[in-house]
Amino acid sequence: MEDMKPSTASTKNLHHDGVGENDTIEVRFTDFCKIGLSVSEDAYEEAIKLFKGTKHLLLANISAIGNGMPEEAERFWFAFVSYSVKRLSEKIRDNMQQRPDDNGLTLCQILRRAKLNIVDFFKELPQYVVKAGPILSTMYGVDWENRLEAKELQANFVHLSILSRHYKRAYRELFLTSDANVDKQSATAYMSDYHRFGWLLFLALRVHAFSRFKDLVTCTNGLVSVLAILIIHVPVRFRNFNLNDSQRFVKKGDKGVDLLASLCNKYDTSEDELRKTMEKTNNLIADILKKKPHMASEYKNENLDNINTDGLIYYEDLMEESSLRSSLDILEKDYEDAIRCKGELDERVFINEEDSLLGSGSLSGGAISVTGTKRKFDQISSPTKTITSPLSPHRSPASHTNGILGSTNSRMAATPVSTAMTTAKWLRTVISPLPSKPSPQLERFLASCDRDVTNDVIRRAHIILEAIFPSNALGERCVTGSLQSTNLMDNIWAEQRRLEALKLYYRVLEAMCTAEAQILHATNLTSLLTNERFHRCMLACSAELVLATHKTVTMLFPAVLERTGITAFDLSKVIESFIRHEESLPRELRRHLNSLEERLLESMVWEKGSSMYNSLTVARPSLSAEINRLGLLAEPMPSLDAIAVHINFSSGGLPPLSSVSKHEISPGQNGDIRSPKRPCTDYRSVLVERNSFTSPVKDRLLAFTNLKSKLPPPPLQSAFASPTRPNPGGGGETCAETGINIFFSKINKLAAVRINGMVERLQQSQQHIRENVYRLFQQVLSQQTSLFFNRHIDQIILCCFYGVAKISKVNLTFREIIYNYRKQPQCKPQVFRSVFVDWSSARHNGRTGQDHVDIITFYNEIFIPAAKPLLVEVGSAGITVKGSQVPEVNNNKDGQCPASPKVSPFPSLPDMSPKKVSAAHNVYVSPLRTSKMDALISHSSKSYYACVGESTHAYQSPSKDLTAINNRLNGNRNIRGSLNFDDVDVGLVSDSMVAKSLYLQNGSCASTSGAPLKTEQPDP
């Protein structure tokens, strides 16, 4: 294009790229390694090699790291490189069974030297992983990211943050912080030592007993066992409880308080699991501290008064002043030996209260998130949102009768730990008692197919679940102490999780078959029950719910996709149906599935290797060349036999797989999306199910623009039909076309919510801004679909915002857009810092290959050349374009460019009262900012391009802004839509969706400018 394109060169001026400065940076890194970290010469040589290989990335991205200052960016990069070398070289040595050649360097030591905190480190690490990935792959192999285990370490940090707070609260409830009989200083020391002893004993459990599967539920059981040890052994004068307290110790008998049963009742733990954990804890005390165990029933001590001592162990002098300090020293040394040379997190940091090292701010890990150490309890869980909050839909009768809501804690404010334990109780009380084989009703469905598929279903389930929950020591992580005992516990844990997932799979499969039979008025469900991909999706969904319940650190999503051979696009087809057909599913698991669906839609289905691209080549043949050029197509789904061989599966005790069934479930058959040439022979498999492409949460929060289908609810099995099959209900469309259209409608719905949230946060009251951003997004998705390839939909939304702002002459800079986007619940910094580009397809100043750039570079170089015609069309809906002048906004016209396809108006989102929003969500009032005149580009083109440092939005006075906010909070509005909290099937209103839907307008214009609503309707 002839237009001048302002670049981000101003940001690059922050770094120095002279040879002398490069040498200086290397000198500083050398000092960091040799003086600061005292690494060995071999470790230094490896570190300096990686640093030299990635130094150019640091210099090119200084402004995008941390606060953008060179000094801080440098410290981050030093930490990234040091941590990478430590973890990856350690894994190589482990595989070669070599001894480590440096001291026991941990992540905490690296961060202390770099003057960084843990939260900030994990926030910035993803862009280093993206940028340095090719270099790390060259040095350490293609599996470097799995061996780095950065995501697992982050999830581990989040879990430990939550557990440490849980332990601290519980300890303060049970024990005094001072003793009236001793001086204050001594009492503080006692409290600190007892508190520290409990945490170190818990860490010993994690190291020696929990091993690979350090899930939140198991760890909570460990903490409760530690509390039991403390209650029995901490001197009575430090107690903050009375054993006669009927609310705290509810389990009593003739022999006194049943301590373990009472703790289980309070913390929703399994008594059987707690007793097993207590046994491990007692063994550790005997083995590590060399304390002699006594049967508590045979020992007299005031600590044991009024306690039923049957089955309890007592250790003499365990908590007495004479031995407490030596016990602490032994536990400290044991832990140091355990983590030596592993480069992992020093988990003692949570008891040391090193706030400067822990950091502050939000951080997510797995299915939960945490805010920094300064966060108060009422911020962990909003005081207005309890387990029985009106924000939660009423559960089905089944969930009320399973005992989940019947606990004494049902009205306590929910914490991450209590929520996890409540969910685990559902799994324990509702799912675990079920049979581990198909029920008679399910067997009838399986036997009613063209041939009996019962054996196939059973064998497949065992193979896939064995792949997800391996029982052998493959992939064993850091194991210290007794390897045999830890492997045994791993195997027991894996077997328990397999059984839970298996029982849940059979239960939901039966419910789905019953529903399908009612729709079809037949019991022959051959097309569905012989579909390999469908069953794998169901098994993956069941396993993911089990993993999410236990909050497992070492198998984070998308592990279930990788181990079952399916893709994100496949899984998205069953999520909604799974929720609808398991009425007792707890609130948190519904929330988890809905959040997964959002993750799938926003980025994962657009990643390389997604089966969505295989359908897209059928539905949009014009995109085939670009899809093939970028190598985006999914590989064939691995066969069941291949998975069985890979995991060394033993089929002993399982029914054999018939030769017929082997043929029928091989890749490419039964709806395999990668083999679309199968002829249509079964009408039941032709229709595409509407419900399999919509989420219950989004159905309620995004109640607008119903899908085009006028047919009654079609069968589930059709969602997995071969893409080239004709869809008789789709107006001549193939199943791929219908499926992609419905998939695109889901993307548009998600974008609508996020656009609306950004408009409200930006305080852009003009209705046409929201309408035009949404219109442009739809046009880009429909006509420039390749802009989404390998990208995040938020990247396109941000570009649409800026493009519409420029064409509409609204003073809104990219800097301000990103500043407000950072406050969105779904924001991740890498979204605007690292956007995928492929330079080989266009004229880009001689640049070739693939790269990741910042959002402004992507906007100028990629987005605008592709989307400028669409942007002009969107701007011309109500404006007049004259020559090369920037289009002027004319709100008196409400037309649509004849050349553009009709698009849906901005949907009518449900109105949400601010009073129903968590108190943790703030209403932001941005300060006044000054504006600048941009003279870097010509007048004719500056409507399209972005520059760093452009003027920000000119707000009204603070008094007017506050008045407007008060009017919204207190004003009377006509509400045309409402949330139905009585419909069990509609799912859950998650916090993030509530936050994003704050002050929604129900389609009414919030502008004071009088701009009319757009009235275009979708195609009939």
Swiss-Prot record:
Region annotation Domain B: where it falls in the sequence: 738-869
BP GO terms, sorted: cell differentiation; negative regulation of G1/S transition of mitotic cell cycle; regulation of transcription by RNA polymerase II
Coiled-coil ranges from the UniProt annotation: none
Pfam families (UniProt xref): DUF3452, RB_A, RB_B
Residues covered by region (Domain A): 415-616
Compartments in which it is found: Nucleus
Record region (Spacer): 617-737
One Gene Ontology molecular-function label: RNA polymerase II transcription regulatory region sequence-specific DNA binding
Region Pocket, residue ranges: 415-869
Keywords from the UniProt entry: Cell cycle, Nucleus, Repressor, Transcription, Transcription regulation
Region (Disordered): 382-409
Function as written in the Swiss-Prot or TrEMBL entry: Regulator of biological processes that recruits a histone deacetylase to control gene transcription. May play a role in the entry into mitosis, negatively regulating the cell proliferation. Formation of stable complexes with geminiviridae replication-associated proteins may create a cellular environment which favors viral DNA replication.
Family per similarity comment: Belongs to the retinoblastoma protein (RB) family.
Protein name: Retinoblastoma-related protein
Species assigned in the record: Ricinus communis
Taxonomic classification: Eukaryota, Viridiplantae, Streptophyta, Embryophyta, Tracheophyta
Gene of this entry: RBR
